[in-house]
Design a protein with these regions (language model features):
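A glycine- and Lys/Arg-enriched "phosphate-lid" helix/loop adjacent to the NTP-binding pocket
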Residues: 335-376
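NAD(P)-binding Rossmann-fold cofactor-contacting core
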Residues: 127-143, 276-283
Length: 403
């Protein structure tokens, strides 16, 4: 028996991990160019379908579920005596939305006009939204027509803009628009630029991971004819977040970030990324960079390295003490990380190989940066003992990651 995902560019998909956590079958990826040839195969029992084939597969089906007919696209196909297509994305989207907000009587704005947008429209209808507005790049109402949709109650991003590896891009900025809830179907990165704006404005929000897991559960029910509890959905969401999200450390130069990060990496399955060490490997001594090219140049390359690594997953990231002085580093770190500020009294801070201490006192640096460490971080730990601090951070991470 064969089950899997049909699509293109699937190496960053979580689908295999989700279906194998469900435990009913092995799951593989089918990156196919020739659909005619694929649908002639006789050894496939069930597939999920993703970009760019959700509409293209319809011509190969013998029948479709009512939801799939309404939406006009398919994400699940069961092969038996006939080939039947389903749309379980709508169930996943309903699950994601209903945990946070009741759409009944609300104005819903949907960004994008592709297959996922069609699913969002039908989901909003199912949940009895009062008004549904679709905004797109080339449609009748465009992203820049803010006055048309500025009073929306709920915003759903159904575009791929901001998805890995093109992180931190967004089709709109919140400001004039202040919905009561926002949903982004993207799940990699964990927080898109849009969702980080929501956090800043204290707007309830969620990414597409729950939608992805729930639609997979519904597909599994179709494949196996077994009923799966919603508790399984939340358990898988937590496992995926715990595995894939990063732990990032910020704090004063010499506060022990590298040591604590090394212990955390050793005690988890996460890979250690020490930003200062990578800079040294690529560009030479940090002391020399400060002395010859100056701090401004150093901050530029530091941000470049942070941007590169913080979009990846399953890491422990030890940042340099001054990483918080560059505003964009906040967004680099928070897209995939829980950020911890670790601290020590000035008397315990190490001065070794800390060029910033040659021109500034510890007190001056602390006065200039403490508010930045506070703004950048999700949690604070006083690093009296590296092993204890590492243990406490891992425990907190495992609790924090579920939301």
């Amino acid at each position: 028996m064969k089950y899997g995902l049909l699509g293109k560019s699937l190496k960053h998909s979580y689908s295999k991990e989700i279906h194998e956590l469900l435990g009913y079958y092995k799951y593989e990826y089918f990156e196919e160019d020739d659909l005619d040839k694929f649908f002639k195969k006789k050894d496939i029992n069930g597939i999920n379908v993703t970009i760019p084939y959700k509409e293209d597969v319809i011509k190969y089906l013998d029948e479709m579920s009512e939801d799939a007919k309404k939406i006009g696209c398919v994400n699940t196909i069961k092969f038996s005596d006939t080939i039947k297509g389903y749309n379980t994305d709508i169930d996943g989207m309903e699950y994601m939305i209903s945990r946070i907000v009741d759409l009944k009587g609300k104005e819903v704005v949907i960004l994008g006009d592709g297959a996922t947008s069609k699913t969002a429209v039908e989901c909003a209808k199912r949940l009895q939204a009062r008004t549904i507005k679709v905004i797109s790049r080339k449609g009748e109402h465009k992203f820049e027509d803010v006055d048309y949709y500025k009073n929306c109650d709920v915003l759903i991003n159904a575009t791929p803009v901001g998805m890995y590896p093109n992180n931190l891009k967004s089709v709109i900025k919140l400001g004039k628009i202040r919905p009561e809830a926002v949903f982004d179907v993207i799940y990699n990165p964990n927080k898109t630029s849009l969702l980080m704006d929501c956090d800043r404005l204290k707007i309830p929000n969620d990414n597409g991971l729950r939608m992805l897991v729930y639609q997979a559960v519904k597909a599994c029910e179709i494949f196996t004819s077994k009923k799966i509890d919603d508790d399984v959905v939340e358990n898988i969401v937590q496992k995926i977040r715990t595995k894939n999200m990063n732990i990032a450390l910020v704090g004063m130069p010499g506060s022990g970030k590298s040591t604590v990060a090394k212990i955390i990496a050793k005690n988890t399955d996460k890979k250690l990324v020490d930003i200062d060490k990578i800079i040294t490997q690529r560009y030479g001594s940090i002391n020399d960079i400060f002395a010859v090219q100056g701090e401004k140049y150093f901050r530029k390359i530091e941000s470049k390295v942070l941007e590169e690594f913080s979009k990846e997953k399953n890491l422990v990231i030890a940042t340099g003490g001054g990483a918080v002085t560059v505003k964009k580093n906040f967004y680099y770190l928070h897209q995939n990380s829980v950020v911890y500020w670790i601290d020590r009294p000035n008397s315990k801070l190490s001065r070794k190989n800390r060029p910033i201490y040659k021109t500034n006192t510890m007190r001056e640096i602390r006065q200039n940066r403490n508010y930045l460490y506070r703004r950048f971080s999700d949690k604070y730990f006083n690093n009296y003992n590296a092993k204890t601090t590492a243990k406490l951070i891992v425990e907190d991470f495992n609790e924090t990651i579920y939301y």
